[in-house]
Structure formats: structure tokens, C-alpha cells
Amino acid sequence: MSSRASLNHFYRTVWNHTLGCAVAVAENASSGGGRASGAIQSVVFPHQPVARLALLSLAVALGWGFTGIARANPTGGVAVVGQATFDYTQPNHLLVTTQNGAGTNYSAINWQSFSIPSGSSTRIQQPNASSMSINRVVTNTPTTLFGTLSSNGKIVLVNQSGIAVGQGAVVDTAGFTASTLAMSDADARAGRTRFAVDGAAPGALNVQGQVIGRNGDVVLVAPSVEVAQSAVIEAPNGAVILAAGQNVDVTGRGLEGIRLNVQAPQDQALNLGTLKGDAVGIFAGTLKHSGAINATQASVDGGRVVLKASGDAFIEGNGRIVATRADGLGGAVQVLGNRVGLTDNASIDTSAVGGGGTILVGGDAHGTNPAVPNAQVAYIDANARLAADATEKGDGGKVVVWADGVTQFNGKISAKGGAQGGNGGWVETSGKRTLGFAGLVDTTAAKGSTGSLLLDPSDITIGFTNWPVATLSGGVFTFPSDANGTMTPSTITTQLASSNITIDTTSAMAGSGDIYVNNGVTWASGNTLKLKATSGIYLNAPISGAGATVAMQAGSAGITNNGPGTVS
């Protein structure tokens, strides 16, 4: 691609008397007797990702250290689609006025540099809010924004050398897409928001400031996308999307408009900040969320949040997700990947006044929904919480924690009916191969029927066993090789106070579909315990529920009462 051919070379910066700023030139070019400045003459922006990322991070850390000598706004703009005028007459302010290409709703500008220091501003004035201005940096100079970038229309900013939105910066547009993946000349001229690796490795995309897309989506595209704790990214009438990948095609609005290819674990998305929108999506090879996500509107995707990784997808620390719909019902949250989980004090909440929403961690019910990829490992920490309650009048929602391999559930799930009416919800915590259950599920309903908890492992033993629970420490997940799932009698007794329980084993994976009751279970809540085994049920201890229902259904091996086993 001719416009990016120069990116295969090294550049240094020299002072340009005509422009009154530092510009990037080929490394063997003469400085022309320009102004001496030790702070800038020796600066080189190689296209190696590590060096470029270090320089970009340094620029962010120093708060744009070149402000004393560089023009305080983007430079060297040339319109390649439509028309653009560049007004530098106001101090520390650039006004760009665009006209769309004939018969289109977009314009495109190639820039030598696109950075805004603190105290400076750039305004891109477009024909209307539905217009789009594509801005590509065609040198090796990274973009660092510490001032204000605003537009009445949608902005696309592309810089393969890296993009940083520093702390204190404000990006205020109708919609905003930033990418460190390349956009080809052909795509720019056609107005296609399609991005891909083009030769050398792209830089990182880092946000520490505020980004708002008032009438559209905010989409951040790079192999590495990082949102700092100080960052706030908002799309009150659209979606906020972090897409860490090698090829990303933005074909339309919302989460359904994103198509990407990722490489795990190299393509990483990290969110420590606050993401707010109709919908929120994080797509990566590896993703970590420990900030705040709020999807509380309903114009595009209706309170929907998707965290999807080809590798690990974890909500950590005090990370939280809240999803509700404008119609008073709970939203929908999916956390999907090869290994998924909530650690520390992480939480997901789809509770709402008219009924709880849906939470899927690692898969959908029974792991059989082809549209929802299944995890191999799911882990819910002891202080982690998932809630899909009806807070006033309505039914509790649906919560699933699933893994084709191992699930360890130590946390808390609530899917309660409303205080003014409604029934409890439906919860499943299952590991197709192995399940460790040591948490608590609440599906009670103050003025309705208690809901249900489904446990769906290959085999399960109820008893005081030395079988160790799975652990997650330092990113290392450890679990025993034994295929049996486990629950203690006290866990079942406690759980039956707040849910009906169904234990349904299968002969999948390494298990044979058996249920072993090795130590007695008693309860007095009146809730139902149902044991359903593909193979056999082995009663080695009594089961007793005062005023309750015990139902058992065995497969080919039948029900075996080994002496002390009774049901009452």
C-alpha cells in the first residue's frame, strides 16, 4: 500500500520553519540548519513494537513532553476524500472543517502527526452528526492526546505507531473509533472501517482520559487495548467495544457489528476503568476486567455485556458489571473463553425491578447452546457474586456457570423473586467432567415459589471427602485428576434452605454417571432434592427431609441401598 510504504523505515524529527513545528523525516535527511534541541533532534520512532510502545508509554508518563517546541495540534493534514480546511489562527486550537466526498457521508484525511497537548484543542466540524471523518497518520509518529478532540460527527483515528489518550484528555464526538491496526487506502477511500496488521507490528492503544460517543459507538481496536483506572468511556446511545485482535471489521452498530480474528494470548484487552453504554463488549485473546461496566440503556442491544476471549476471560479485584434494560427487566451478561471466572470481590448484577436478567459464565444451560462457546475451566471465588434478582415484582433470572472440563464454584449466586410478587429463578453450576461446589445459591421468593439449582457433573459424591477443591493462584488453576464432583452434606443442607436442588449426572468425559451418598443429608425447609443418574445411585447413608420431597431416578445400574442408606 503506497501510503504506508514509508513505515518500513526509521524516522527522526527536525524543526520545520514553515510549519513552526517538529516533523518526522527520513533518518538520512538533512536538518537544514534547523533549531537545535537536544530534547527532540535525537528522537527516533522505529517500527519495532517494543521500542514504539516504550516511547508511547514515556510520552504518556511525561504528559506530552514536546509541548514546548511542537505545534499544539495535528499537523500536515491532506484531504484524500472530500475536502478539508485547516484553521490554526486561534492559539492552541485547530479547527478542521470537512466536506464529505461526492455521494458519500464521509471524508478522509492523511496526517503527518495527530497529537493534542494539554490545554490545546482540535475541533473537526462535519456537515452533520451522521458524517464520518477518517483520520490516518501516515508517518511513524505515535498519537498522544492530552487536550480536547471534539466533533459533531463520527471520528475514525488510525495510527499504526500507537494511540494514547492521556489522563485529563477529553474526546467528545458523535461516535469514535480508534485503531492501531492499519486501514488500507482502498478502505479509507471507500469509507470501510476495516482494520488489519499491515507489515510491522502495530502499537498499543491506551486510554487514561475521557472518551464519549454521544450518538454512536466507541470502538477501540489494537492487538493490545488498555483502559486505565482513571478512564471513563461512554456511549449513552450506543456500544462501547474493546477489540484486541489482528483483523477487525466494523460492519455496523453495536456488538453484532464487530468481526475479528485474535491470537491468544498475544492479543490482550485490560479494563481497569469505567465503561458505560447501551451495550459493552470486550473481545480479545486474553482479557481481564477489574473496573466497572454499566450497560443500562436500551436503544441498540438493550443492556447487554459480552466479555469474550479465545483464551482467558477473568473479572478480577473489585471488577463489576451491571446490566439492566429500560423496560425494567434485567440485562444479559456473557463471560466466555477457554478459562473463565470471577476472582476476589468481582460481581455481575442483572437485577431489575421487573425481573432478573441472564448471566452466562463459561456457557449456556447444559452446555448445549451452539451460539455460546463453552469454557474448559470455570472458577468462581469465595467473595465473588452473581445476581439476577427481581427487586420489586417479577421472577428471578437465569444464571449459568459452566465448563466442559472443571468448574469450581465457591461464591454466591442469587436469582430471587420480587418482594411484591414473582417466583425464584433458575441456576446451573456444572462441570461436565468435574464439579466442586462449595458456594451458596439463593432462589427464594417472598410471595412466590422457590426456584431451582441444577448441578450437572459426570459423577458426584456427597460426603466428607478428602477430595481437594480446585484452586486458582497466580493465574495457575490446579485441580485433582479424579473425575468425581463433590459436595459436603452440610453444603446440601444449607443449599436446600434457599433452593430446590437437582443433581443430574451424565456419563460424559471420564465419569460414568453415578451418584454416591456417603454421608447423611437432612433438611427441614420443605424444598425438593432430586437425584437423577445416568448410571446408578448408591445410598451409603440416609437422606431425610422433613416435609420435603426426595425424588430419585437411576439409569442402567439402578438404585443400590448399601445397608444404612434410607430415604424419609
What are these regions (language model features)?
Residues N8, L19-C21, A26, S30-S568:
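Extracellular and secretory-pathway beta-repeat/beta-biased strand scaffolds
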